[in-house]
A protein has these predicted regions:
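Small/polar, glycine/serine/threonine/aspartate-rich low-complexity segments that form flexible
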Residues: 37-45, 49-58, 68, 107-129, ...
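Transmembrane beta-barrel architecture of outer-membrane proteins
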Residues: 65, 79, 123-125, 171, ...
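A short glycine-centered flexible hinge/capping loop motif at secondary-structure junctions
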Residues: 204-208, 412-416, 453-457
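Short terminal targeting/anchoring segments
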Residues: 210-212, 418-438
Length: 460
């Protein structure tokens, strides 16, 4: 074939892959450029923030062991991983339409008359067929690109599940510690109340107390037993939640009291840029979805233009296998085909409108994800200082209550106050100890939330 005859095919191939998709531009972030870190502790002079791996952030070795186990066995993470594999296969399936398709075939037939001349007629044939869509206007290219972005979005979704799992396992473990510590305090308080009851009962025998004080002492004992039963149920539920996250029902680690040194504090630069949110997998997933919607506009635009496909083949046919591949038995064909959209009652325009509206929806979704992420970080930053102040005040209040209880007991022994004063001091001390535990747990959870909101938890 002469070069002149090859030229049209070269031009066609050069044009293949042109795209009508709009140029992608990342939307501006609809949030302030920096987070407000005024009056916030743990601010350093670093120029930027770097996420620590979760093995560094979590100091407690037991937490690290549980997270490692969950990353292997958790069903939600397995499902997310399988969805990534499915999306990858779907992308390969869609992308295959952009390339030539080559198929071979072969057949044989035997026929004859039932009566008369009963000679058998034989016919053998082979063929090789090729087809290719000349993607002049990028319909297939943009469809493939949209599927690729969907696949990458699924990968980001899997990362988000990974990060959430790391956070949930740590929070569930600390919740187990909290439930155990609350149970320990309730049991210790019950023992103190029982000692007080024995003391009041002894005073009643000597006439130094009365039946009312004894009944009051018995009442707080029963109330504390009820609280113990409640705490036991909470501990069992915390264990069940942890086992579900781990994806296995083996022996859990022995619950321990809350340890404030189980994780590092998130240290932040003085000028923390909101650009750090762009590394969060949920925001990256939303941007991938936006890119896919952008590519779908290109595919919808291409539907307004002609589509050309080429089909060709070679075949042979013979009544004898020995001569099947002789040149004299061969044939060839070449079938170019063009389809021009003329009238479809507005179908193509409707498809384009849908693609453009979905692209606008993806922009709104992307912006909303950023705003939600900004709020998560801002909330965690605001709560950090508040919790520190609450804990400091609660610790001072606890110290004051301990002194109050000691004095109330001394005054009661000398008959200066009623037993009700002692009960009030004991109940206040009991409630304050529980509140302090809750606040320490809330501070740990808030630090984990801040770490996760800034995109931490993916790297080890």
């Amino acid at each position: 074939m002469s070069p002149c005859k090859l030229l049209p095919f070269c031009v066609a191939l050069a044009l293949t892959g042109c795209s009508l998709a709009p140029d992608y531009q990342r939307p501006a972030m609809p949030v302030p450029q920096q987070f407000s870190l005024s009056q916030n502790g743990l601010v350093n002079a670093a120029d930027n923030y770097q996420n620590a791996g979760w093995r560094t952030f979590f100091v407690d070795n037991q937490v690290k062991t549980l997270i490692s186990e969950a990353l292997v066995n958790n069903r939600d993470l397995r499902m997310a991983t399988l969805k990534v594999q499915e999306a990858r296969a779907q992308y390969r399936l869609t992308d295959a339409d952009r390339y030539p398709q080559l198929n071979g075939e072969g057949s044989g037939s035997w026929s004859g008359n039932l009566k008369g001349n009963t000679a058998t007629t034989r016919e053998f044939s082979t063929g090789l067929n090729a087809s290719f869509d000349l993607d002049f206007f990028g319909r297939l290219k943009n469809t493939s690109e949209a599927e690729r972005q969907n696949y990458l979005a699924t990968e980001e979704a899997q990362r988000a599940v990974h990060i959430l799992l790391v956070s949930n396992v740590a929070q569930s473990y600390f919740n187990q510690q909290l439930a155990y510590a609350q149970l320990q305090i309730a049991e210790e308080t019950l023992r103190n109340y029982q000692q007080s009851y024995a003391f009041v009962e002894k005073q009643l025998l000597t006439g130094s107390s009365n039946v009312l004080a004894l009944e009051q002492a018995r009442g707080v004992i029963e109330s504390t037993r009820s609280d113990i039963a409640k705490r036991q149920g909470e501990l069992a539920q915390a264990n069940n939640a942890l086992q579900l996250l781990l994806g296995s029902y083996g022996k859990l680690p022995q619950a321990q009291t809350v340890n404030s040194d189980s994780l590092q504090s998130v240290k932040l630069p003085a000028g923390l840029s909101s650009q750090i949110l762009l590394q969060r997998p949920d925001i990256m997933e939303a941007e991938r979805a936006l890119m896919a919607a952008n590519a779908n506009i290109g595919a919808a635009r291409a539907a307004f233009f002609p589509s050309i496909s080429l089909t060709s083949g070679i075949s042979t046919a013979s009544s004898d296998l020995s001569s099947l591949f002789n040149a004299s038995s061969g044939m060839w064909n070449f079938i170019p085909k063009i389809e021009i959209p003329i009238f479809n009652a507005g179908r193509n325009q409707a498809n384009l409108d849908i693609a453009e509206i979905r692209q606008q929806q993806s922009v709104v979704n992307y912006e909303q994800k950023i705003q939600n992420a900004f709020k998560e970080v801002a909330d965690a930053l605001a709560l950090r200082q508040s919790l520190n102040d609450q804990i400091s005040a609660q610790q001072r209040y606890l110290a004051s209550l301990q002194i109050t209880l000691q004095r109330a007991r001394a005054l009661y022994q000398h008959g200066a106050v009623s037993y009700l004063e002692v009960l009030d001091a004991e109940r206040s001390l009991f409630a304050t100890r529980q509140t302090l535990l809750d606040l320490n747990y809330a501070r740990q959870v808030n630090e984990i939330s801040l770490y996760t909101a800034l995109g931490g938890g993916w790297q080890q």
